[in-house]
């Protein structure tokens, strides 16, 4: 079951989707050009043990018309509004990609509202070598995602086919029905000129923060589990979060931080594929079963 909630936020209403039934609510935050329907496989894998509250971040999906500002401060304010609207005093938060950075920022700024966090293939930033230009790095890193926002399609089926052929999706265990639902939730416009509804301004604003986004994860004072994919955005062998980076971060607070690799996944299939979604669902269940501690008794690292 998918139910839409409209949550009042600055500038209008944020669309939040309640995915599945039964169990405790968990706030699930998607990636930079994604939408709430990226969580369909995870919601199904939870099998009634939790309900995902999946917002479309402002500038995406059914929240695409929400105005600026964009960026981490705006997203964390919207997340706080969702928790308040749903009566969640202290919740489990899970984020993928950009959503992992948003969850880390929220948990660092509002530890009293977070029971446990789950960060999926995001949350940390690799330091750039001195000889690498930051602007060129960002252009190369986000290039394929940004290029998609400029494409137009004659019909929804053409967009579905584009996604099926995507290197991260081709031959994967992503459900065809989930992929269609995810793509349809992104489409806007009229037949003959359909396109992604992601606001270009939002992506540009987020890109401007990318090199700083990894800092909040280092000051977390709540328990957190990080799951990483061994393959990248294009199913390439360069992961979003290298193992050595994740392990070093976890080593700074070994009692509070846990890191795991989800085998045979890439940046997309770690949440959208059947096998990745099962592992993510298990991490969410572990988070829900963790003891509730008073964050005021814990010290930031």
Report residues per predicted region.
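Conserved HGGG/HGGXW glycine-rich cap/lid loop of the alpha/beta-hydrolase fold
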Residues: 15-65
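Conserved alpha/beta-hydrolase catalytic His-Asp/Glu region
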Residues: 150-207
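Active-site loop/oxyanion-hole signature of alpha/beta-hydrolase fold enzymes
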Residues: 17, 53-94, 271
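N-terminal cap/lid segment of alpha/beta-hydrolase-fold proteins
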Residues: 1-13
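Catalytic histidine-centered segment of alpha/beta-hydrolase-like enzymes
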Residues: 262-275
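Conserved hydrolase catalytic core segment
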Residues: 89-132
């Amino acid at each position: 079951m998918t139910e839409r909630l409209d949550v009042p936020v600055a500038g209008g209403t944020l669309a939040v989707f309640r995915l599945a039934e039964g169990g405790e609510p968990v706030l699930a935050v998607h990636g930079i050009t994604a939408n709430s329907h990226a969580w369909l496989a995870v919601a199904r894998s939870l099998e009634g043990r939790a309900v995902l509250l999946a917002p479309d971040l402002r500038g995406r999906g059914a929240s695409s018309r929400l105005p600026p500002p964009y960026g981490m401060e705006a997203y964390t304010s919207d997340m706080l509004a969702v928790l308040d609207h749903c009566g969640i005093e202290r919740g489990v938060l899970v984020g993928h990609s950009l959503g992992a950075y948003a969850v880390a920022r929220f948990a660092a700024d509002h530890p009293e509202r977070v029971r446990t966090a789950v960060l999926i293939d995001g949350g940390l930033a690799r330091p750039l070598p001195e000889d690498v230009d930051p602007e060129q790095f960002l252009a190369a890193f986000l290039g394929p995602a940004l290029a998609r926002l400029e494409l137009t399609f004659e019909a929804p089926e053409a967009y579905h086919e584009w996604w099926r052929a995507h290197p991260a999706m081709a031959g994967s265990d992503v459900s065809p029905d989930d992929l269609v639902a995810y793509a349809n939730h992104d489409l806007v416009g009229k037949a003959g000129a359909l396109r992604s509804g992601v606001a270009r301004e939002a992506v540009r604003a987020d890109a401007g923060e990318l090199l700083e986004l990894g800092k909040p994860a280092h000051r977390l004072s709540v328990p957190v589990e990080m799951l990483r994919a061994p393959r990248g955005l294009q199913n390439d062998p360069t992961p979003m979060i290298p193992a050595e980076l994740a392990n070093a971060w976890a080593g700074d607070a070994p009692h509070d931080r846990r890191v795991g690799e989800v085998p045979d996944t890439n940046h997309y299939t770690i949440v959208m594929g059947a096998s990745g979604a099962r592992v993510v669902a298990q991490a969410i269940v572990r988070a829900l079963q963790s003891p509730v501690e008073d964050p005021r008794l814990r010290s930031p690292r």
